[in-house]
Structures are given as structure tokens and as C-alpha cells.
């Protein structure tokens, strides 16, 4: 049986996941999403994994959902489909998830990118929401997540036309944090993940929670949540280690305690 996602250790504390359906342009069928959820669940409970990098291949990150699978589903079947729960599991992953995008990230592939915390793009990266061409709309958060990221105007345009978004445009509008040479995309993403992996795990977790919560809470609620975590972290061993290392002029060794 084909290995739908290849998993490997890319650096100390960094798990690299590579989508592996090249003959289907890494189309995200249910089996692939289920596999991704299982790998993220394992990473969640593995203290050795501090950050995850998710990538595809040079030509294609993921070209959307698998239409051969979706075409068999009617409205009733779609109501019972497991996909929404799989997307929720991906969203619930508490450790940093970085996507390294080369080539096409279309439809569900674009939505998978929008589920990640940071995005590194190769110069050949291209994004789009082409569902309108099928008489549909994005069904895994494409309208909601993208609008919160780039605003209503651009999301309306891109979702209603299916226009392609270049890597340069993606960086300009905050879809990715950096555009790099295509052949170095994964390397840059792993370097970023390795840098994060050296930080205090507890602090990284609540930073992610605090920032993700901005679309779900008011400013006052967000500030309260931030302050609560600030006080909580003050009681951790990692905080003491960070302060001691600063005064002793050495690099801290964080243990997630």
C-alpha cells in the first residue's frame, strides 16, 4: 500500500511530513487527511517533536480535494462525511505547524495551508480557490479563514473568480511570511522550525493559542487570556531557566516544565 504521507526527522525536534500522492497531484482524499491527523496526533504526544513542517513536492503542494471521491457523494452523504471532523483535528494541533509550499496549492490544498501557523513559499508557489468553476464554494474554511487573513475584498474576488495568486502576492497580503528560491523551500521551513524548537515549549503553545484566539474573542478577552498565560508561565521551570541563562550569559535549555 502506498505511503500517503512520508514522515521523517528533519532536524532536532522537527518532524517533516511530505504528502505523497504525486500521481494525483497530492489530492487530499479522506485517507490522506486521516493519515495526517494520525501523524499529528502522534506528534502531539511525542515530547521529542517540538514543531512540524508539512510539504508536498516541487510541482505541487496539494491540488485540492480528490474529485473522484467527492463526485460519489450526494447532499445527504456530504452531511455525514468525516472530513469536517478531520479538519477540526488538524486545527486543534497545539504545536507549531509550518507549511512549505512549492507549486500549486489549490482548493483544499490552499485550505490546508490556511490551517497552518506559518507558511514558507517557493517562488513557484501558486494558490487558488477554484471551486467556483464547479458550481461550489470552498468547504473547509476557505472563505472564512482567508477573509480573516486578507480581508473581504480580496477574498470575494478570489473565491468568486478562482484567480491564481502568485507567491509574491501571497507574501504581499500575508498568506505567507517569506518567499524563497523553490529548491530551498523545505530547507528554509525546517530552519525556521528548528529555531522554534529550541524555545520553551510551554510558551510556544500558549503563544499559538493566544494568536489563534484573536478571531474568536474580543480584545479585552484576548488581553485577559494573554495575561493569565503570562502569570502561569512565570511559575514554570522554563521561565526560571530562561532568566538564569540570561544572567549567566549562556543559552537556555528548556524542558517544557
Would you name each region that the model predicts?
Residues 1-57, 88:
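Conserved CoA-thioester-binding segment of acyl-CoA-metabolizing enzymes
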Residues 31, 35, 82, 89, ...:
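Charged catalytic carboxylate motif
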Residues 89-202, 232-236, 241-244, 250, ...:
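Crotonase-fold acyl-CoA enzyme core
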Amino acid at each position: 500500500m502506498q505511503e500517503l504521507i512520508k514522515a521523517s526527522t528533519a532536524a532536532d525536534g522537527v518532524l517533516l511530513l511530505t504528502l505523497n500522492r504525486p500521481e494525483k497531484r497530492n489530492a487530499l482524499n479522506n485517507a490522506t487527511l486521516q493519515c495526517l491527523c494520525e501523524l499529528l496526533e502522534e506528534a502531539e504526544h511525542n515530547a521529542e517533536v517540538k514543531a512540524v513542517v508539512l510539504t508536498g513536492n516541487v510541482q505541487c503542494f496539494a491540488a485540492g480535494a480528490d474529485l473522484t471521491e467527492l463526485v460519489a457523494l450526494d447532499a445527504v452523504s456530504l452531511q455525514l462525511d468525516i472530513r469536517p471532523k478531520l479538519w477540526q483535528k488538524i486545527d486543534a494541533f497545539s504545536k507549531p505547524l509550518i507549511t512549505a509550499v512549492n507549486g500549486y496549492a489549490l482548493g483544499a490544498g490552499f485550505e490546508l495551508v490556511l490551517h497552518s501557523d506559518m507558511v514558507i513559499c517557493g517562488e513557484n508557489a501558486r494558490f487558488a480557490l477554484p471551486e467556483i468553476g464547479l458550481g461550489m464554494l470552498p468547504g473547509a474554511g476557505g472563505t472564512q479563514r482567508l477573509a480573516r487573513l486578507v480581508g473581504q475584498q480580496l477574498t470575494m474576488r478570489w473565491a468568486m473568480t478562482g484567480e491564481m495568486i502568485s507567491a509574491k502576492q501571497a507574501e504581499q497580503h500575508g498568506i505567507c511570511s517569506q518567499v524563497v528560491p523553490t529548491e530551498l523551500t523545505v530547507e528554509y521551513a525546517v530552519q525556521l522550525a528548528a529555531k522554534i524548537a529550541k524555545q520553551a515549549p510551554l510558551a510556544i503553545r500558549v503563544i499559538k493559542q493566544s494568536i489563534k484566539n484573536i478571531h474568536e474573542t474580543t480584545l479585552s478577552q484576548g488581553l485577559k487570556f494573554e495575561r493569565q498565560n503570562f502569570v502561569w508561565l512565570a511559575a514554570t521551570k522554563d521561565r526560571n531557566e530562561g532568566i538564569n541563562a540570561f544572567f549567566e550569559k549562556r543559552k537556555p535549555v528548556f524542558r517544557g516544565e
